[in-house]
Amino acid sequence: MGTRLLFWVAFCLLGADHTGAGVSQSPSNKVTEKGKDVELRCDPISGHTALYWYRQSLGQGLEFLIYFQGNSAPDKSGLPSDRFSAERTGGSVSTLTIQRTQQEDSAVYLCASSL
């Protein structure tokens, strides 16, 4: 069996609306084999126009990956390689895809939203 990678997907809130609803991420955790593709989904707080993806590797600080703001072109400056991609459909749900996973991809992946 190939090397297994652990993708802990956590959620992070940058503010919350008056109802207390928060960012939703799925899956909440993901274990995969090296070389497999992984897709992570983020559903932001209703009404929030900005969406961010970060990751945190063991013993490291948060690392910015990508930022979406409304209908503007995303800031992809933090994506570590062409194996990483993200999209946001309809100004709402975002999907982060990691193709051909490697050992160094093992991290906590976080999504946040804001006004």
Curated annotation (Swiss-Prot):
The keyword Endoplasmic reticulum does not apply. One of its GO terms (cellular component) is plasma membrane. Pfam families: V-set. Residues 22-115 form the Ig-like domain. Disulfide bonds join C42-C111. It is found in: Cell membrane. SMART domains: IGv. The keyword Repeat does not apply. Its main location: membrane. Keywords: Adaptive immunity, Cell membrane, Disulfide bond, Immunity, Immunoglobulin domain, Membrane, Receptor, Signal, T cell receptor. GO terms for biological process: adaptive immune response; cell surface receptor signaling pathway. Alpha-beta TR is a heterodimer composed of an alpha and beta chain; disulfide-linked. The alpha-beta TR is associated with the transmembrane signaling CD3 coreceptor proteins to form the TR-CD3 (TcR or TCR). The assembly of alpha-beta TR heterodimers with CD3 occurs in the endoplasmic reticulum where a single alpha-beta TR heterodimer associates with one CD3D-CD3E heterodimer, one CD3G-CD3E heterodimer and one CD247 homodimer forming a stable octameric structure. CD3D-CD3E and CD3G-CD3E heterodimers preferentially associate with TR alpha and TR beta chains, respectively. V region of the variable domain of T cell receptor (TR) beta chain that participates in the antigen recognition. Alpha-beta T cell receptors are antigen specific receptors which are essential to the immune response and are present on the cell surface of T lymphocytes. Recognize peptide-major histocompatibility (MH) (pMH) complexes that are displayed by antigen presenting cells (APC), a prerequisite for efficient T cell adaptive immunity against pathogens. This is T cell receptor beta variable 7-2.
